[in-house]
Amino acid sequence: MQTAYPDYRHYTAREYGTRVGLYRLLDALAAADATASFATNGAIADRYPEVIEHLLAKGHEIVAHSSDMNGTIATGIAEEEEKQLIESSLASLERVAGHRPRGWMSIARSQSWDTPRLLVEAGIAYCCDWVNDDLPYSMKTAAGPLINVPVNHELSDRQVIGTQQQSAESYAVQIKDAFHWLVGEAEESGPRFLPIQVTPYIMGLPYRIGAFEELLRWLADQGDCAFHTCGEVASAAR
């Protein structure tokens, strides 16, 4: 259903994430002694700087997530326009965080042919846009190397719950199934990476957060694995 502007129905549903859902996720992460990476728009820094401050105070990582949710990138966009979009996002986040993010996730994983090079030129060390592997890897650009950390959207709550209309409990089962499979591969072929990608306004709802807390507790109790930020994963891949 399309809602006419001003679309408060969708806007406030998502704002629930910054007002309520985020803090439930932070409590769940703290209970599991886990740090995480938060893909964050420049607009969040401009409008809700306290959100950035709370994330950093808890030891979490900020990953630049474009200027706002309309800041998609595609071939055909002028290079200067794309550079400005990247720079505006990084500058807004740096102004509040006190440091420039090392990582980048594009809106809808959108990139142009020039994006990897422009990210390196802007000081980005890794991106999370390419989902074609279970391990991070380095790619070459004309400006130098860029690490890709494959945060697969197939395992996100937006895909499993939002698109496929499954429950939070079903999401947890699928993460556990993926964990068991990857552990089996790791025993034969070396380490594997399992991204857990959740969204505050989706997983932070009161009838879903319990399943997420239980999932984190279960993962924390497993041997031979650990929670890592995307930045830590990227550093290990260098």
Can you name each region flagged by the protein language model?
Residues 1-12:
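Active-site gating loops and adjacent loop-to-helix segments of metal-dependent hydrolytic enzymes
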Residues 4, 32-112, 144, 150-163, ...:
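Metal-dependent polysaccharide deacetylase catalytic core of the NodB/CE4 family, i.e.
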Residues 13-26, 30, 42-49:
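Aromatic- and glycine-enriched glycan-recognition loops and surfaces
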Residues 17, 77-84, 166-170, 207, ...:
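Alpha-helix N-cap and loop-to-helix initiation/capping positions
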Residues 22-26, 49-53, 86-90, 116, ...:
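Generic structural signal for well-ordered alpha-helices
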Residues 25-34, 92-99, 185-189, 219-224:
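A structural motif corresponding to the C-terminal end of an alpha-helix
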Residues 91-190:
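Active-site-adjacent pocket scaffolds in enzyme catalytic domains
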Residues 126, 176-238:
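C-terminal domain-boundary segment and adjacent tail
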